[in-house]
Structures are given as C-alpha cells and as structure tokens.
C-alpha cells in the first residue's frame, strides 16, 4: 500500500515516522519552511527531555498527486477546507484523522463520498514542536491500550477498512475498526470543546481546577452537547457524564485537571491554532444542533 501522510505538524510527523520505520511505503506532505527543513534533516525526533535528536528520513512531497492508495490527513479542524481543495479530482482513499464534528457528508461532497474514511490519531502521534524538532509525549500503559479508531461513514466493515487496519497494525499501531466512528468523533468534540475552552479561559488546567464553579459550568456544557447528539455517546463510558451526580463529577474533573496527564497534555497548549480549532469544532456542533 502506497501511503501519504498529509500534514507535517506534530501528529503527521510522528505518524509518518512510525510508518516509515516499520518499513511501509509512506511519504509526508509539507509546505514552505517545514518542507525545506524536512528535506534537509528528515523528521527530527527529540529523545525525551534531553538534547539528543534522532532523524528519520521520511520521503517528503509538496503535492498530493502521487497515485497514493491511501492519504491519511492529520491537520487541524479549521485547516480541512484547504486540504479538501487539493484532494478533489485525485484518486485513492482518504482517511481523515483529526477532530471533526460535522460528519462525513461535507468531506464526501468535496472529494467523493466513496473515498472517505473517518478516524482519530493514536496516542503515539501526540507531542510538541520545538522549532523543527518534534518532542513526542510520553505514553503510559493506559494510553498505549487505547486503540486508534477507524471507520466507514456508514458503519460497515468493508474489505478496505480491514486492509487499512491490518496495514497499521503491522507498523505497531493499535488500530481498530469502529462501526460508530461519526458518533465517536461527535462525542469526543462534545467533551473536548468545553474542556479546552474553559482551560484556556482559566489560564491552564490547574487554574481551572482551582475554580469549582467554572468546572461545574463546563460540565453543564458537556451535558448539553451530549444531550444534543442524535445517538448515544461513543464510547459508552461517556454516558456517565450524564448520569453520575454532579458533585462527584466535579470532584473527579478537578482531580484530573491537577494530574500530570492533564498538565502535560495538549490542554496546556493555548496557541492560536488550538483556539481556532476549538472554535471551528464549536461551530460544527452548533450547526448540528440546529439541524436536529
């Protein structure tokens, strides 16, 4: 299978490096200064918090027209429109691996419904960018056990879905076919948007934990989002946010926000790109609620 990873930020760089080191035929699409850096140095991966840097010579390209069997898109939500324009008129399946709450319909309208698959990137693709060097976020036993979900928009288990899951598993990626991928993504957004926006408004996860009223308000927004969904939450464990007592959930959320998991996660990233992505996700959820 000839693969293209579209997006050379943290997620795309880490994902393509893993696939390349596993021996898969993969290229990484980049533009501008990032493209020039990758051509000179390859994907540069920092070794933990140290200064040692490992270079992975992933082939890089500037355009997506290369006869790829599968293009994996790893960009921010608000960057997807530009990606769709560049993929329209090409052939090959496209796996969208990013935050998305608008469903598969607008993606299919732009590039062809038969090409679209939905998913979400694995924990191994998380980290931070330090100049041109990617610092992978340390994984834990629990995060390594969380599978990377991939699914057909209509929930079917198709030959291409099974083939893609097998391909990623050969690279050591814990991929799994998810029959309710659209509901999975909407559930994730229902929780992530209020959490991320409240964390940024407070000045960080610990600052939010110190304000129980703000945590309670965030929980109310999460519950509103989940109630607006046309289906039950996926995974089903998110239903606990609708049923457990408010006081218990507020206490658990405050404890989580103070944990190293939250402090060292993307929640501490208040970059303009993160703010723009959360804003676009919020727009998608509002539009979905109006249609419903």
Language model region names:
Residues 1-51:
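NAD(P)+-binding Rossmann beta1-loop-alpha1 motif at the extreme N-terminus of oxidoreductases
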Residues 43-60, 192:
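N-terminal glycine-rich dinucleotide-binding loop that anchors FAD/FMN and/or NAD(P) in oxidoreductases
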Residues 182-226:
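Active-site-proximal catalytic alpha-helix in oxidoreductases
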Residues 100, 105-184:
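Rossmann-fold dinucleotide-binding core
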Residues 3, 25-27, 94, 116, ...:
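Hydrophobic anchor at the start of a short beta-strand
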Residues 52-136:
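Rossmann-like NAD(P)(H) cofactor-binding subdomain of soluble oxidoreductases
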Residues 223-292:
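NAD(P)-dependent Rossmann-like dehydrogenase/reductase catalytic/cofactor-binding core
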């Amino acid at each position: 299978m000839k693969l293209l990873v579209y997006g050379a930020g943290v997620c795309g760089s880490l994902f393509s490096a893993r696939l390349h080191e596993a021996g898969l035929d993969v290229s990484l699409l980049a533009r501008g200064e990032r493209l020039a850096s990758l051509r000179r140095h390859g994907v540069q991966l920092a070794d933990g918090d140290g200064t040692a840097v490992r270079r992975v010579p992933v082939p890089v390209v500037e355009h997506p027209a290369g006869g790829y069997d599968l293009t994996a898109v790893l960009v921010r939500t608000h960057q997807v429109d530009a990606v769709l324009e560049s993929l329209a008129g090409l052939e090959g399946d496209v796996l969208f691996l990013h935050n998305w709450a608008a469903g598969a319909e607008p993606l299919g309208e732009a590039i062809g419904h038969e090409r679209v698959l939905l998913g979400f990137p694995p924990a191994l693709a998380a980290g931070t960018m330090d100049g041109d060097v990617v610092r992978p976020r340390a994984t834990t036993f629990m995060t390594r056990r969380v599978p990377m979900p991939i699914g057909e928009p209509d929930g079917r288990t198709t030959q291409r879905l099974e083939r893609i899951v097998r391909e990623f598993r050969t690279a050591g990626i814990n991929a799994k076919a998810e029959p309710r991928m659209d509901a999975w993504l909407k559930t994730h957004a229902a929780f992530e948007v209020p959490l991320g926006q409240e964390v940024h408004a407070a000045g960080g996860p610990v600052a939010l934990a110190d304000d129980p009223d703000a945590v309670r308000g965030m929980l109310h927004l999460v519950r509103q989002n989940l109630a607006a969904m046309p289906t039950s939450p996926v995974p089903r464990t998110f239903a606990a946010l609708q049923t457990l007592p408010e006081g218990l959930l507020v206490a658990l959320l405050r404890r989580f926000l103070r944990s190293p998991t939250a402090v060292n996660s993307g929640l501490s990233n208040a970059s303009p790109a993160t703010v723009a992505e959360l804003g676009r996700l919020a727009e998608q959820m509002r539009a979905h609620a109006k249609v419903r």
